[in-house]
């Protein structure tokens, strides 16, 4: 099996998902929410079709995906589930234990096609 390099953060990537953390996202939260419209534009076009079908059509069966911290090189597996016009990523608290983010911090997320995971980095 080939060993591919991690897809690094590129501030010029138009498909970055920029999330400014709210107090809810950092105050003992187990989830982080992302708007469905943002994911439809910047994430879903790159995901495998079977994953999309499971996320969008089989809502009682959420999907587990890897979320990779590009700085620490740690992958955390989270459950992604649709909640109205948002998607919730359950398991976010495992990342918070290591990262100590504050409300107002901006996190960039981007899809890594070669590793089929969502990479992230604290950018502001």
Swiss-Prot record:
The gene is ARF46. Residues 32-124 bind DNA. InterPro entries: B3_domain, DNA-bd_pseudobarrel_sf. Its main location: nucleus. GO terms for cellular component: nucleus. The lineage of its organism: Eukaryota, Viridiplantae, Streptophyta, Embryophyta, Tracheophyta. Keywords: DNA-binding, Nucleus, Transcription, Transcription regulation. This is B3 domain-containing protein At4g05630. The keyword DNA-binding applies. The keyword Transcription applies. One of its GO terms (molecular function) is DNA binding. It is found in: Nucleus.
